[in-house]
Structures are given as C-alpha cells and as structure tokens.
Regions:
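Regulatory and interdomain segments flanking nucleotide-handling catalytic cores
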Residues: 1-560
Length: 560
C-alpha cells in the first residue's frame, strides 16, 4: 500500500475546531464595570488611567498645579521618604505597585543574601545617559574637579537618604564592574550620575540644574537625553500555526529526504500518487512542536542576550514572536538588526557588522539556526518574517504617549510597510515627528544590501569627520520640488546624481558620494516602496540618519 491513514489525519480538523471555539469565546467574554460609577477625580500621573491613591476623596479634585502645598497622601509620603517618587507625583494603585515592588524586593529578599543593591530597574533617564556614560568609560573615566564635586554632592544626598544608585544597563554594568580597569570612585560616580541629575531636575526647562552642568563638564559634552523603545512581532503567526496559507506549507514530496524522493519518482507514478505528493502537507503536532521550539529559542534565550548583553538595553517582555525592549539610542539600529536576524536565523552581512559595530562574540546566525555559546537553537527560518516598530523619544516625554506611538509604528510596519519591515518614529522634544518606514529586505532573501544597511552607512557617514550633516538639511530642502511628471525609472538617475552632488559638496569622497547616491535613489524608487513617495523616503531616511549621527550619540567631535 502507498499510504494507510491513521488517527493522526484528524489532527488538522480538531485543531481548526478548537481554534474557532477559542475565537468565539473571546467575542462573548464579559467585562464588568467598576462599581459606584468607576473612577473619580484626576487620574494617576504615570498611567493616566485610574484615580491616584488618597486617604481623602476630596483631594481627588485638586488639579496637579495646586497639589504642592495640599496635605495629600503622596506629599506626606515624599516628605518622610524623599526617594519614594518624583516631586509632585501622585500615582494610582497599579503604578504604585510597579514603582515600589523593586524597593521591597531589594530590602526583603536581596537583603537576606547580604547583596547591596539599591535599585535594579533601568529608568528611561538612565538609559539615555548610558550612551554618554559608555563613551566616558571608553575615555578612561577621568574624574577631574567636576567629578569630585559630584561625589561630594552624592555623599550629602546619601546621608539624607535622598539618593538611590542608578541601575545601569547590564552591558554597561559589566564593563564597569569587571576587572580592575575602574576604581571605586569611578564606579560610584557612574552609578550616581543619573540620580544626581534627577534630584536637581525641574519641570521648568529654563531652570538651572547645577548637577547637570557638572555632569556635562565631566562627560565632555551635554549628556544624551534620548532613548529608544522597540516592539517586534512576527508576521502572520496565525497562518504559520493554522496552516491556512499555502505559501507557508511545504509540498508533501518536499518533506522527504532527497534520496527517497528520487526513488518515489520511479515507483509511484500513478496520478493519485502525484496528487498526494503535490498537495500541501497538513498541520501536525510535529509542525507545532517545531514552531514552539523555534519561538522559545528566540524569546527565552536570544532576545535577552541581544538586548542586554550585546546592546545597552533592558528587555521588558519576550514571549513567542513578541519582543518589547528599552535600548540606548546609539544601539537602536544594532538591536533592531540583531533581533530581526535572530528571529529568522539569517546571517548578518559583514558590512552591517562593521558599520554598526555589532558584538557577535559567541553568536553565529544562519541557515535558520543560531549557535550561541556552543548551544544550537532552531529558529523560524528565512521564509518567516517579522516587523518592528521603534520610537526615539526624550526621557521626560510621557511614557503613555510614547507607548501609543510605539504601537502605531509597529502597525505602520505591518500595514503601509507591507510586513517584513521596520518603522522608526523620531519624537523631538521641540515638537514634530519623523516617520520612517522601510522593508527589511528588497530583492534578496538575506539582509545583504538591505535598507537597514543604507541607513546604517548614512549614519556612519554623517558621524564621521569628513562629511557635514548639512548635506541632510540641504537635500531635505529641495526634495519637495521633485518633478511630479517623471516616472520612477526616469527619476532614479536624477536622484542619484543630485544626491551624489550634495554629498560631495559637503566633504564626501566623490566615489563614495556616487555610491551612496545610487543606493539611496534605488531605495527610494523600489517597487516595494510604491505606496511612499521617493521624496518622503529620502527625506525621512536622511532625517533619522542625521539625528543618530550627532556628536552626543556617535562619539565623534568636529569643528563647529
């Protein structure tokens, strides 16, 4: 006999029925309302969703600007324990638990083990400053007069129980604490800088912050104030699991070993045999186990290693095909690239490794697998795609608004980006937003000559000493005036020549300018970006590259 069915043939039907049952249960799930009319008064300063905690309901009607001298629960708490929350901050129950549980854990759990840890949750401010701190450490961490004055202020604040050591990103903490490269004063200074800056901060942007001024003198430049958030999600995961998309299923004949396939050609020649072999293989327990194994390897092992060990970041969540992470702004492109390559097990091209200065020690990606410290991990493979959204924001920007922008960026990558794309939204503190959406791959199945490579190379070009960032501003000025009557094919040489000319005028080598002009023009007119105007592609790419190339992020200085 050619094939004898067994009970396993019922698995696809059973899975489909259970999937429909679970989907229908969601649509009829009850969501009871809060009793007595729900929330009242002003909302939590952090989440903006629930009323803030109080011992007197009348206090809930006091506007934020008038709470300073009111006898609220939070003003009482801050007066007794200054490090409990920020000045004037009034939190709801959930936000309070999130704010206080790290302190409780440190005092009641780590304290039993004689581990001296004040804080282990990385704040957005600390993450932003970590970009400048890493550069300071690479310069040998000189203390100088400014550093000594900051250490004195740290002693005074600690004596008053008004100072917590900052939790630095793991990568930076390892560099700081391992070996004998840095002494006790340098280590203490690095861990107290963010806290000292926050202690002297004010809601008034014009207010003088003496601590921030001293930190600027210590670091040699104004401390970095921007950080990034990443949200990555696998594409069409439902179709991969349910097997409803034929493009994500192999033909039955392709699941056999090549030698067996050759024998089958000679032995099974009847039409019904060929119809069976050409049919798409139905979903099975082994397929679901393979997908589960691949997603576990990515989420539980690779995601944290990439975000926290190879970049200055903090993994917030990793489950299956979903990843959310905080990352220092100078590591944004590197983190995005490594996460995407790790999801599908794609090799990272050498030019990207060099340009982004990727840390691949102990990690090898390729062939749908990863080899991490000698451990082989199965991944989703090159045909599985993932889309990512990223937001660059000021550390003082409302986190709720930043998260909404992050989710919108991820939807933009999956919607207008056409999936297998990344979207970066740049939120400048002065106002306005730049939205860049690019595919991960154009024509090749790998990341070679990818749009990310173009973006990374432009960032490195502007960060160098030869090319002025003025090239980005000048180009953005004439982009809106492109002739609308020209088709994309005719527009390519015009864009390439003009981009090369502008780059050469601002100091780029002629051959290099021609190369970058051609790459950027090719990206702008590519059919994959047909829904986006070429002018918008170039303008937004240059804007993001120029922002990431500024001295506080690139570490390069030039004559002004």
């Amino acid at each position: 006999r050619f094939y004898r069915p067994n009970a396993g043939v019922l698995y696809p039907a059973l899975y489909a029925l259970l999937d429909r049952l679970a989907a229908s249960a969601k649509s009829v799930r009850a969501a009871p309302q809060r009793p007595d009319g729900g929330e009242k008064g002003y909302r939590c300063d952090l989440t903006g969703e629930a009323e803030w905690l109080t011992h007197d309901l009348a206090h809930l009607s006091i506007p934020k600007g008038e709470r300073k001298h009111a006898d609220t629960l939070w003003n009482r708490a801050i007066s007794k324990r200054p490090g409990l929350s920020r000045k004037g901050e009034h939190l709801g129950a959930l936000a309070m638990l999130k704010r206080l549980w790290p302190r409780w854990f440190v005092e009641h759990e780590l304290g039993k083990c004689d581990i001296d840890v004040r804080r282990f949750v990385v704040s957005t401010h600390t993450l932003a400053v970590s970009t400048s701190l890493e550069r300071w450490l690479e310069q040998g961490a000189p203390i100088g007069d400014a550093g000594r004055e900051l250490l004195v202020k740290a002693d005074l604040a600690e004596h008053d129980d008004a100072l917590d050591y900052a939790a630095l990103p793991r990568r930076l903490m390892r560099k700081l604490m391992r070996g004998k490269t840095y002494d006790a004063q340098q280590r203490r200074l690095a861990r107290t800088l963010p806290a000292l800056m926050e202690a002297a901060s004010s809601d008034d942007p014009e207010a003088d912050n003496s601590n921030a001024r001293l930190v600027g003198q210590l670091l040699g430049d104004k401390p970095e104030t921007y950080y990034a958030l990443i949200l990555l999600d696998g594409d069409s995961m439902g179709a991969w699991i349910s097997g409803t998309d034929p493009d994500k299923l192999l033909k039955t004949r392709d699941t056999f070993h090549p030698q067996i396939r050759e024998r089958m050609k000679a032995r099974f020649t009847r039409p019904e045999h060929q119809a069976y072999l050409d049919a798409r293989r139905a979903v099975s327990p082994s397929r679901h186990m393979a997908i589960s194994s691949a997603l576990n390897g990515f989420a539980l092992t690779l995601a944290q290693d990439i975000v926290e060990n190879r970049c200055k970041g903090k993994l917030i969540y990793a489950g299956g095909d979903d990843v959310m992470a905080l990352v220092a702004v100078d590591d944004l492109l590197a983190c995005l690239t490594l996460l995407r390559a790790a999801y599908g097990g794609l090799p990272v091209p050498a030019p990207l490794v060099t340009t982004l200065k990727l840390d691949l020690e102990g990690l090898k990606l390729g062939g749908g697998h990863a080899l991490l410290d000698g451990k082989l991990l199965r991944l989703m493979g090159e045909h599985a795609t993932a889309s990512a959204g990223a937001v660059i924001a000021h550390h003082s920007a409302p986190l709720g608004a930043v998260l909404r922008t992050l989710r919108a960026a991820e939807k933009r990558a999956k919607g207008p980006g056409g999936r297998d794309a990344f979207a970066i939204t740049l939120l400048k503190r002065g106002g306005g937003a730049t939205e860049l959406t690019l595919p991960w791959r154009l024509d090749a199945p790998t990341l070679d000559d990818s749009p990310m490579q173009v973006l990374a190379q432009l960032t490195a070009l502007f960060a160098g000493r030869d090319t002025s960032r003025k090239a980005a501003y000048v180009t953005q000025g004439w982009m809106p005036h492109l002739p609308a009557q020209l088709g994309r094919d005719a527009l390519h040489p015009l864009l390439a020549r003009n981009l090369a000319y502008q780059l050469a005028r601002q100091g780029t080598d002629t051959a290099q300018a021609d190369d970058y002009g051609h790459k950027l023009a090719t990206l702008a007119v590519h059919p994959r970006l047909a829904d986006t105007g070429p002018a918008d592609v170039i303008t937004h790419t240059l804007a993001v590259a120029e922002f990431l190339a500024r001295e506080s992020r690139s570490g390069n200085t030039r004559e002004r």
